[in-house]
Swiss-Prot record:
Function per UniProt: Blocks contraction of smooth muscle elicited by high potassium-induced depolarization, but does not block caffeine-stimulated contraction. May target voltage-gated calcium channels on smooth muscle.
Organism listed in the record: Austrelaps superbus (Lowland copperhead snake)
UniProt PTM comment: Contains 8 disulfide bonds.
Protein name stated in the entry: Cysteine-rich venom protein asurin-1
MF terms in GO: calcium channel regulator activity; toxin activity
Major place of residence: secreted
A GO term from the CC aspect: extracellular region
Record lineage: Eukaryota, Metazoa, Chordata, Craniata, Vertebrata
Length: 46
Protein backbone atom coordinates (compact mmCIF):
# COMPACT_ATOMS: atom_id res chain seq x y z
CA UNK A 1 0.00 0.00 0.00
CA UNK A 2 1.01 3.61 -0.40
CA UNK A 3 1.10 4.12 3.39
CA UNK A 4 3.45 1.16 3.80
CA UNK A 5 5.77 2.52 1.07
CA UNK A 6 5.79 5.93 2.76
CA UNK A 7 6.67 4.39 6.14
CA UNK A 8 9.49 2.37 4.58
CA UNK A 9 10.85 5.49 2.88
CA UNK A 10 10.88 7.36 6.21
CA UNK A 11 12.56 4.49 8.05
CA UNK A 12 15.16 4.04 5.30
CA UNK A 13 15.98 7.76 5.25
CA UNK A 14 16.18 7.89 9.05
CA UNK A 15 18.57 4.93 9.16
CA UNK A 16 20.72 6.39 6.36
CA UNK A 17 21.04 9.66 8.27
CA UNK A 18 21.96 7.80 11.46
CA UNK A 19 24.65 5.84 9.59
CA UNK A 20 26.18 9.09 8.36
CA UNK A 21 26.79 10.52 11.86
CA UNK A 22 30.43 11.38 12.58
CA UNK A 23 31.85 10.09 14.80
CA UNK A 24 29.91 6.89 14.33
CA UNK A 25 27.88 5.52 17.22
CA UNK A 26 29.08 2.30 18.78
CA UNK A 27 25.69 0.77 19.56
CA UNK A 28 23.06 2.51 17.43
CA UNK A 29 20.25 0.15 16.47
CA UNK A 30 18.33 0.55 13.22
CA UNK A 31 14.83 1.97 13.42
CA UNK A 32 11.96 -0.18 12.20
CA UNK A 33 8.21 0.32 11.98
CA UNK A 34 6.21 -1.03 14.91
CA UNK A 35 2.58 -1.46 13.87
CA UNK A 36 1.30 -1.73 17.45
CA UNK A 37 3.03 1.53 18.43
CA UNK A 38 1.66 3.21 15.30
CA UNK A 39 -1.89 2.10 16.18
CA UNK A 40 -1.51 3.39 19.76
CA UNK A 41 -0.18 6.73 18.49
CA UNK A 42 -3.07 7.03 16.03
CA UNK A 43 -5.63 6.33 18.76
CA UNK A 44 -4.09 9.07 20.91
CA UNK A 45 -4.20 11.52 18.01
CA UNK A 46 -7.85 10.69 17.24
Amino acid sequence: SNKKDYRKEIVDKHNALRRSVKPTARNMLSMEVNSKAAQNAQRRXD
